[in-house]
């Protein structure tokens, strides 16, 4: 079993309806799928790959060797207790945001700025596809994420998490990234095309998200689940630690503004059914998520203050 791979370019041709159906089915049955022919230039993707890997080697690799995950793993190995590090991720991370560009590594600033704009455009297109498949007005999801604003400067949160999962001497004792669902909206992942490790939970089984050169992996977060009234599900996923290879992962998140009110869209409800989720302010949801990220998601929807 493998996650769906969808040719996004066919949205503009004779196979549009088939492609829309494939995306709808992937959102409903998986919450994860891969896009090929998505429109982001290959030359740009190659630059992003090289610069991200170079940045890790020159600016982050040495620091990771003395990081908390390394120290804790070494201590655990010395104890030889048979335990596993349950609350630690074997991951190096830095985050790129619009307002912290002065903190971006200088050698990647121009390229990553260009890449983020391309990914932001792809996120908008994907949300419009979801609008259409859910029977929502065009632009509904994006408008909801931007506090109901249709024009002007976007208020939605758009961040890019650049991760590396370095070789781990004891991958059986630590997670690359613990299992979780994503809190926000639409996630667009440019993952390593050589080293695997990302898995998604499907029908009780962990399925590898197969490396596919220059594809963009799409996954739906908790807020898409809420807006669709459960028709689309946010999927549990994790990253395994590896003994060999330094796995690269560049995930961009198009999330609601912290002030945005999120709830099931009326047209997304099945006829005769009740709303399955409360309406809440996304920032309030994030307050709950911060303490419950790696726990079952259903209690989060109950714990958040409803409007």
UniProtKB/Swiss-Prot annotation:
One of its GO terms (molecular function) is L-ascorbic acid binding. Pathway: Alkene biosynthesis; ethylene biosynthesis via S-adenosyl-L-methionine; ethylene from S-adenosyl-L-methionine: step 2/2. 2-oxoglutarate binds at residue 247. Residues 106-134 form a coiled coil. This is 1-aminocyclopropane-1-carboxylate oxidase 5. PANTHER family: OXOGLUTARATE/IRON-DEPENDENT DIOXYGENASE. Its cofactor is Fe(2+). It comes from Arabidopsis thaliana. Fe cation binds at residues 180, 182, 237. Binds 1 Fe(2+) ion per subunit. It catalyses: 1-aminocyclopropane-1-carboxylate + L-ascorbate + O2 = ethene + L-dehydroascorbate + hydrogen cyanide + CO2 + 2 H2O.
